[in-house]
Amino acid sequence: MQNWETTATTNYEQHNAWYNSMFAANIKQEPGHHLDGNSVASSPRQSPIPSTNHLEQFLKQQQQHQQQPMDTLCAMTPSPSQNDQNSLQHYDANLQQQLLQQQQYQQHFQAAQQQHHHHHHLMGGFNPLTPPGLPNPMQHFYGGNLRPSPQPTPTSASTIAPVAVATGSSEKLQALTPPMDVTPPKSPAKSSQSNIEPEKEHDQMSNSSEDMKYMAESEDDDTNIRMPIYNSHGKMKNYKCKTCGVVAITKVDFWAHTRTHMKPDKILQCPKCPFVTEFKHHLEYHIRKHKNQKPFQCDKCSYTCVNKSMLNSHRKSHSSVYQYRCADCDYATKYCHSFKLHLRKYGHKPGMVLDEDGTPNPSLVIDVYGTRRGPKSKNGGPIASGGSGSGSRKSNVAAVAPQQQQSQPAQPVATSHLSAALQGFPLVQSNSAPPAASPVLPLPASPAKSVASVEQTPSLPSPANLLPPLASLLQQNRNMAFFPYWNLNLQMLAAQQQAAVLAQLSPRMREQLQQQNQQQSDNEEEDQDDEYERKSVDSAMDLSQGTPVKEDEQQQQPQQPLAMNLKVEEEATPLMSSSNASRRKGRVLKLDTLLQLRSEAMTSPEQLKVPSTPMPTASSPIAGRKPMPEEHCSGTSSADESMERPHVRQANTSASSTASSSGNSSNASSNSNGNSSSNSSSNGTTSAVAAPPSGTPAAAGAIYECKYCDIFFKDAVLYTIHMGYHSCDDVFKCNMCGEKCDGPVGLFVHMARNAHS
């Protein structure tokens, strides 16, 4: 501890003149009373009584405001020698006065902060981002409420410095600190928040509609349109011209510039303000804003707006579905415009687009550099142009052929397991004689395309117990519902499975297809080719109608077994190239109903009944066909007669999607009769499901294989549900939610742990 007895006594005599002048300037004195610095300096032990009395009065007046700081100061300040007691009183008074001034500055600063918090939302409040040249809106506030702070002189600083050595650290800082500058408070928002929040506001503005750029503010009074507008983060709003890129900071300037890009005869101006536009609905929305008319209201909150585009954009704020996701990163957004900006900025690729209910929709694509708002549908996709959402997709199921449904008479129905699952799709029976040639049934490229193009296929030569393509089911039975427990969109599933099956053809199947395609032209009659070619050329395709079926083919016919031959023909490609291939681009799925003639032992009605099998039949143009007379089975001179020999071929169903009529028949066995195998494989087909011999269950050979997971299914519904989880672009990516999995095990674990509705 410091020994004050050995410390040299501080000499205050040389500073008495400064103390006297300080008190003379700040303390009121009696008239005619003056302090002589020289006389005080000559007799330092005799303190002037008038100055001491005034000082005591001043201290008593301020004692109630400064009692605690003075007690602390007196407790921490050591007592100097008794000879300098008079000078110490002058020093204490000066220090107290500086502390009082410091306290006043702090009070004014706190009052200014409170005033700023109450009025920060007003346009006249403080704005740290005020552009240069514009007046500071807080100048009037500080000028009227704050007093200028006196600056300390060099003499006072030099005087306080040696004394502050003996005081505590807090008092030393207060003594050496100049009076505080009353500066405006900084913006409460951080730089990162100020960058993120305006970006979100910009997303909502740019994604809603073109109509919203005039609807951003609630009022268009003279102040708002002629003065810059600042958001809550202090950022000034600007208006950028989409034609030339000029940026304006006020609405009046922006409208004046926009007028230069408009044709004079198309300018529409608001009668109440300088607003101009070329579109009538924009002017209508603007006038509604003047009248405070907001007819569109959100059904989930109190939000109201002047047009439906703004309401649609607002409704996305209530949804938890992020429809647009990036395939290369974790970015997800609800707005298509923001998604395009992300893809352009980072060069990423878009992921699977979701509908408003969260269902994946592979038919929607993102035109990254296009000007069209929202996603667009693929060419020939199941979504009609201009539709983006679950409503558009579901409407395609309803857009089918009512004439097809009305033309079908009431008839006995025999359903299998799959047909029962598909809402009991009826079997079509036929009993009339058809032409002898075997036709080809091309499956539409996508479920959205009408199967009216199938009407160019010739009649089938045998009775039908055929598994129809899923696309035909959806087109001809518009009231068919989805799987109630999986909520599978069969229409989307059909389009995906068509593309998936094409990639899993075995080499053996490709060779068979090439051999069978070479015999296609020899097995068709010229008159049927001419007739159906005329129908395909002269008649227009109605996408909303199904394939018309002749009334004479819709009569009640005895049900007979028929082999379902699924064939995938890839035309105009090196994989499936053949000399007789058609000029259609891409890959086409084909179904061929090759003649499976019944043996004499199978002629009884009991043997004609189809056992329980996961193969349904449908009222497709190839389903209800006339039976082949038995006398045709005796001839062997022509290719048509050789196909009609009473031989039963038995084959196993390959890994083909039943719901989508996928033709993956890599496991198909060869025909039991070698003589009829080459002639019976006309029109480029492979036997996938054949009628079993007498006494053999039909379901014994029905096996469905998933080559991705190396799993076999005996039930078509289970196989269809399983294949619905494989995505077309990545087989181990969940088709329901878009999550990528590691192999088949990861996909099964994902299916078991996550609910897909």
UniProtKB/Swiss-Prot annotation:
Transmembrane segments: none annotated. InterPro entries: Znf_C2H2_sf, Znf_C2H2_type. Keywords: Developmental protein, DNA-binding, Gap protein, Metal-binding, Nucleus, Repeat, Zinc, Zinc-finger. It holds the Pfam family zf-C2H2. SUPFAM superfamilies: beta-beta-alpha zinc fingers. Residues 30-51, 171-213, 367-416, 511-535, 602-694 are annotated as: Disordered. Belongs to the hunchback C2H2-type zinc-finger protein family. This is Protein hunchback. The gene is hb.
